[in-house]
Amino acid sequence: MAEEVSSLMKATVLMRQPGRVQEIVSALRRGGGDRLQVISDFDMTLSRFAYNGQRCPSSHNILDNSKIISEDCRKELTELFHHYYPIEIDPHRTIKEKLPHMVQWWSKAHSLLCQQRIQKFQIAQVVGESTAMLREGYKMFFDTLYHNNIPLFIFSAGIGDILEEIIRQMKVFHPNIHIVSNYMDFSEDGFLKGFKGQLIHTYNKNSSVCENSSYFQQLRNKTNIILLGDSIGDLTMADGVPGVQNILKIGFLNDKVEERRERYMDSYDIVLEKDETLDVVNGLLQHILRQGDCVELQGS
């Protein structure tokens, strides 16, 4: 008889190797909260991809769709999206082939935003007026990590100021959260003049842009990782972590499901297909922390 996590029985759950997943989950459970850290993407991973059939905005979209952006700028940003997004998710191109296109996309978009005379105080307002939503079950997720002293490292190619404000407005911005993202750089008179540090895009989310060796050094006893992402580029987010013993990779498959399913199942341990909740992640956390409901099942 094998003990399994009941949330893994959800219809949205796909696993190429259920036995392997069970081994990793058992190892995470043996380590408990003391050994665990979570590394996650933000846009369309912690935030929702869609609600009632409507696409939800990413942190970039929130700004693109806001009234502080001119109509011309919005049009140009939309054109960039329609040109580059198909390249980003094209299953027939290698990451190496996509890289220069992603750099061009982010650089052009950031350059357009810097021409808009965006002011720092407008960020909270723009987020408040947006339709951004965190996935169902977000409060339990953020609170469970915080109350069990489990660090949450958010590695995002979005806009740091925006996603931080979303988490704040949802009242779950706890002290255990560390964010690496594209943060806005404001002039002394409060206008956006650029972005700080190295550009982070979908396909360089790894130790090359991560000036966080000291962050991970402090957590060197946290040798077990749950990684959450929604793109193939998210799989490298834990590359800068020293001494990893066990890592469980969970991928949200939100878009172009049919053509990307096989690749996701080859790459992620657990794939969540069109699942707008954090139920599976929360169920796993409860299980690892020995708080969860388990069902007895025949071994996988």
Curated annotation (Swiss-Prot):
Keywords (A to Z) from UniProt: Acetylation, Cytoplasm, Hydrolase, Magnesium, Metal-binding, Nucleotide metabolism, Nucleotide-binding
Catalytic residue positions: D41, D43
Binding residue positions for Mg(2+): D41, D43, D230
Leading EC class: hydrolase
Membrane-spanning residues: none
Catalytic activity: N(7)-methyl-GMP + H2O = N(7)-methylguanosine + phosphate; CMP + H2O = cytidine + phosphate; a ribonucleoside 5'-phosphate + H2O = a ribonucleoside + phosphate
Binding positions (CMP): E88
Molecular function GO terms recorded: hydrolase activity; magnesium ion binding; nucleotide binding
Residues that hold N(7)-methyl-GMP according to the record: E88
GO BP field: nucleotide metabolic process
NCBIfam families from the UniProt entry: HAD-SF-IE
Family, similarity comment: Belongs to the pyrimidine 5'-nucleotidase family.
Task of the protein: Specifically hydrolyzes 7-methylguanosine monophosphate (m(7)GMP) to 7-methylguanosine and inorganic phosphate. The specific activity for m(7)GMP may protect cells against undesired salvage of m(7)GMP and its incorporation into nucleic acids. Also has weak activity for CMP. UMP and purine nucleotides are poor substrates.
Protein name: 7-methylguanosine phosphate-specific 5'-nucleotidase
